[in-house]
């Protein structure tokens, strides 16, 4: 069986270094807010290309903390609007509504799966305060047009970079393109921890300091609480593991890209819509999305032939029960993607033999 993702193999790539890093933390006797967290945040900020990195508990917390900090800074208030792609994972929307802000859903492009920048400006109202782009599946969502819209309308640009660690737009990495970016280190991500973890990167010192306080119960000094905060911290074990894996991220992404280009070049089946070659060259391929009108049939066929797949995602946010107030929105492109998308295995641990098997099966379908 070719598993969709075998995390044990991902960890084993650098197993001895990871074990040494974990043991170093165990031996230190310091498990929160210590030297590993500080070092990782410095190293990750340098990698991304920002002045600041603040570790936190997970990617959802990172998004939520950014918006909460903007409210504490007086830049946003209850009822303000955040423009966001309609075809994202629900965490993106949860962060907005948890802050009593309104998500304004914008359709994606079918060829890139990213927010359609030609549809953004028509969604802006007097209450719009930010555009939140999502580098979905590992592909950069930023465009010069989006940057120009933010400047002309005085909007904050927030990046959800949970799925695109290491991706670039020109010479700049995602996570450094906007005012702030949220990162997830969920184990399955390109840069994954051995548990939950997250971070915010930004060049805004006031924002970074506010987020750091909010993530530490609202405290910037011990036992002094400036805000009604939360407990959301990146622990020392996860920070130590991430320091090891960060050193290999570019190489891992290069292997992912090599496999993706093989898929794009060699899968020749008119029943399948694959990402373009240009897409494949630009993405870090957290997910390799294939569109197929017979998606469920394709998934069953692959499983019967020993290949696991996943769907990202079967139900879009506006069709979820928790957001029934959005259910009447007309979002046909989003719904097409969610009805047809199938993610085939793509990660740096796949062998060439496994890649050949996947290509062969998809060509025979």
Segments predicted by a language model, with ranges:
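Hydrophobic/aromatic ligand-binding patch that stacks against planar heteroaromatic rings
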Residues: 95-96, 149, 190, 237
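PLP-dependent aminotransferase class I/II
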Residues: 8, 37-42, 47-54, 60, ...
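Phosphate-binding glycine-rich loop
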Residues: 30, 35-81, 95-99, 105
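N-terminal "arm"/small-domain region of PLP-dependent enzymes with the aminotransferase-like
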Residues: 1-30, 305, 345
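Conserved PLP-anchoring active-site segment centered on the Schiff-base-forming lysine
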Residues: 67-124, 130
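Helix C-cap/helix->beta junction micro-motif
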Residues: 99, 152-153, 305
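Active-site phosphate-binding strand-loop segment of PLP-dependent enzymes
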Residues: 111-193, 201, 343
């Amino acid at each position: 069986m070719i598993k969709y993702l075998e995390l044990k193999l991902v960890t084993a790539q650098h197993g001895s270094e990871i074990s040494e890093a974990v043991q170093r933390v165990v031996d230190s006797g310091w498990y929160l807010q210590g030297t590993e967290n500080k070092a990782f945040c410095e190293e990750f900020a340098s990698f991304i290309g920002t002045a600041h990195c603040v570790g936190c508990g997970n990617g959802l917390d990172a998004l939520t903390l950014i918006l909460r900090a903007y409210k504490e800074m007086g830049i946003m208030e209850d009822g303000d609007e955040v423009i966001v792609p309609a075809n994202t994972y629900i965490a993106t929307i949860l962060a907005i509504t948890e802050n009593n802000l309104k998500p304004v859903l914008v359709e994606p492009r079918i060829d890139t799966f990213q927010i359609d920048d030609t549809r953004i400006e028509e969604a802006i109202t007097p209450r719009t305060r930010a555009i939140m782009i999502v580098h979905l599946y590992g592909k950069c969502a930023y465009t010069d047009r989006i940057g120009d819209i933010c400047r002309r309308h005085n909007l904050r640009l927030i990046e959800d970079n949970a799925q695109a660690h290491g991706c670039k737009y020109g010479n700049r990495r995602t996570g450094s393109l906007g005012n702030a970016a949220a990162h997830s280190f969920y184990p399955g991500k390109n840069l994954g921890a051995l548990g939950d973890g997250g971070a915010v990167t930004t060049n805004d010192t006031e924002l970074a300091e506010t987020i750091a306080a909010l993530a530490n119960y609202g405290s910037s000094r011990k036992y002094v609480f400036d805000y009604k905060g939360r407990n959301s911290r990146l622990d020392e074990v996860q920070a130590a593991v991430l320091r090891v894996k960060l050193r290999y991220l570019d190489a891992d992404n290069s292997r992912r890209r090599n496999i993706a280009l093989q898929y794009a070049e060699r899968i020749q089946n008119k029943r399948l819509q694959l990402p373009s070659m240009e897409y494949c060259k630009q993405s870090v391929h957290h997910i390799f999305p294939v569109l197929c009108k017979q998606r469920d049939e394709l998934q069953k066929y692959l499983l019967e032939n020993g290949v696991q797949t996943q769907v990202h995602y079967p139900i879009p946010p506006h069709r979820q029960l928790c957001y029934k107030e959005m259910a009447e929105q007309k979002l046909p492109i989003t719904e097409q993607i969610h009805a047809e998308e199938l993610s085939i295995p793509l990660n740096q641990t796949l062998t060439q033999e496994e890649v050949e098997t996947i290509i062969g099966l998809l060509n025979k379908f």
